[in-house]
Amino acid sequence: TSDYSVLPVENSLEGSVGESNDLLVTVNLDAVGEIYHRIRHCLIGIGSLENIDTVYSHTQALGQCRKFIQENSLKTVPSYDTAGSVKIIKDLNKNNVACIASKNAAEIFGIPVIKQGIEDNRNNYTRFLVLSKESNEDSLMSKQNASSKKKTSIIFSVKHEAGALYQIIKEFATYKINLTKIESRPNKNTAWEYNFYVDFEGSQDDSMIKEMLQKIKGNSSFLKILGTYPITNID
């Protein structure tokens, strides 16, 4: 078993990775770090671009290469992940199908790269959360970055009361805590109810933030603290 796992949670062009964020609600792991990775997509297959009519990849990758796909009139087939789509192409062994994935994935499966850099925007980054079974304060990553500025991630849902969401959001203003992200996702267990995902600057170990989180807990029907971790800047 590994000490850490890495989960893609959002992309700078296509937004949040829904499956990953849904998983964070139930997974019993602490967020102990974040990584920003520059995404460079390649068209991979055994045929030439002129022969290809269908392309496989994860929905996020297909969305990030929308312009290239439209310009070449390609049909799209969603797959579970980008690396998995390379295996599909290898197994199909047809010159009219290709996939979108990384150059590294092409090398692993021994499939040629037809064209590199097919993403719509060069400013294409995916943010990953680093997850660990260890608590935040015990993780090696947190110890190595003990002096860094911190960020905390939480998930909560609100009660069905007028102004319930406002009562939570106003606490961040009251305590002068800077929000870096807020968004909602449907609750998979109850129709038309939502979970809210919030990132904010500061540590859950700070006494003021502890006090704020207690107030948020009192105004929410569900609260999960994913963890506190060092803030990472994009180079």
Question: What is each of the regions a protein language model found here?
Answer:
Residues 1-235:
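Domain-level signature for soluble enzymes in the chorismate/prephenate branch of the shikimate pathway
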